């Protein structure tokens, strides 16, 4: 009896949001944020195909920068730079240049190149860690016997 009541209550709870949303006039497919339509804001969304996939925060400019290229070895002339001291590797960032507290859209003369430290990692091989774990377990089992 209690199970039947619990199932009935669950079904009613699942149906309630669907029934209530039919009476609302706004269509979920047509909902947009205000800044997506305002042409005066730098936060206006652009075509997703044109937006770079990888963005990182640059503490120097305080803005989101785009990653350019891969993690590379620092040349000997830059080994003393702050971004090369930690790991010996660097990655290029394309950051907006701030002038008069205005964030500009991307263009050649309004962007600046910065670097950040990175660590050169081997390509991920998820199966190797699992095999090492299992070999360790097998070794422990054999030692116990």
Curated annotation (Swiss-Prot):
Predominant location category: secreted
GO cellular component term, pick one: host cell cytoplasm
Motif (RxLR): 31-34
Keywords associated with the record: Host cytoplasm, Host nucleus, Secreted, Signal, Virulence
Disulfide feature: none
Signal peptide segment: 1-20
Homology family: Belongs to the RxLR effector family.
Function of the molecule: Secreted effector that completely suppresses the host cell death induced by cell death-inducing proteins.
Domain characteristics, as noted in the entry: Has the canonical translocation RxLR motif, but lacks the canonical EER motif, which characterizes most oomycete effectors identified so far.
Protein name in the entry: Secreted RxLR effector protein 43
Biological source species: Plasmopara viticola
